Amino acid sequence: MSYGPLDMYRNPGPSGPQLRDFSSIIQTCSGNIQRISQATAQIKNLMSQLGTKQDSSKLQENLQQLQHSTNQLAKETNELLKELGSLPLPLSTSEQRQQRLQKERLMNDFSAALNNFQAVQRRVSEKEKESIARARAGSRLSAEERQREEQLVSFDSHEEWNQMQSQEDEVAITEQDLELIKERETAIRQLEADILDVNQIFKDLAMMIHDQGDLIDSIEANVESSEVHVERATEQLQRAAYYQKKSRKKMCILVLVLSVIILILGLIIWLVYKTK
């Protein structure tokens, strides 16, 4: 399995600002969160090799690049969530509630992925520091320098000269080790800066969740208001139906009375003509 920098953790696309709708941002964020989780699992695997026989400068480089690219992916997702919050709400109350539920689920998933990622980041930092401490403790540079200072300028035998040359070779190797230590310290500083970036993302996420809560209250208030209007409209419809039914009943009675009157008048007229 290759643990080099992964292109899958980047989102290729045309440069320049683009207008994105709610669904496309949701889809991109969901994909990013999945990639963050996958990268976290790979970082754990690489981390388990630190301090073992598999530990090497190549492993360190791959680990650093992978965690840094994952950190950038988290920052990109954070910006997308901010963009998501700035989109205008749909007119339909049901669509507002649906979008609210989608954003709520997305932020929960993002928060969980960030928690796992940051926990691994902190553990990597601890293991790197432990590795550096062991390397410094095993360094022979200071001891070799003291031996060189105490060494006489002249040598009594060829054996002493060879011993001095051997010591200088060991010092050169130790200096190379120290250069690797410096590189690891630089990587740790970058890792700690990335951890601070994740802390800032958590703060932004907390603010978005707070704003989401205000939005939920607003939507619920609109829903309650709509329900009140619906209830009132229902009452008015029921009242109108009652009056309409009552009016129809009156019309039927009136028609019946008129029919009786016409019938009576018809009988009277018929009787009058009959008597003549």
Curated annotation (Swiss-Prot):
GO biological process, one term: cholesterol efflux
Key words of the record: Acetylation, Coiled coil, Endosome, Golgi apparatus, Membrane, Phosphoprotein, Protein transport, Transmembrane, Transmembrane helix, Transport
Impact upon substituting residue 88 to R: In a breast cancer sample; somatic mutation
SUPFAM superfamilies noted in UniProt: t-snare proteins (SSF47661)
Positions where N-acetylserine occurs in the chain: 2
PROSITE patterns linked: SYNTAXIN, T_SNARE
InterPro entries: SNARE, Syntaxin, Syntaxin/epimorphin_CS, Syntaxin_N, T_SNARE_dom
Coiled coil ranges: 33-131
Protein name, as recorded: Syntaxin-12
Source taxonomy: Eukaryota, Metazoa, Chordata, Craniata, Vertebrata
Gene: STX12
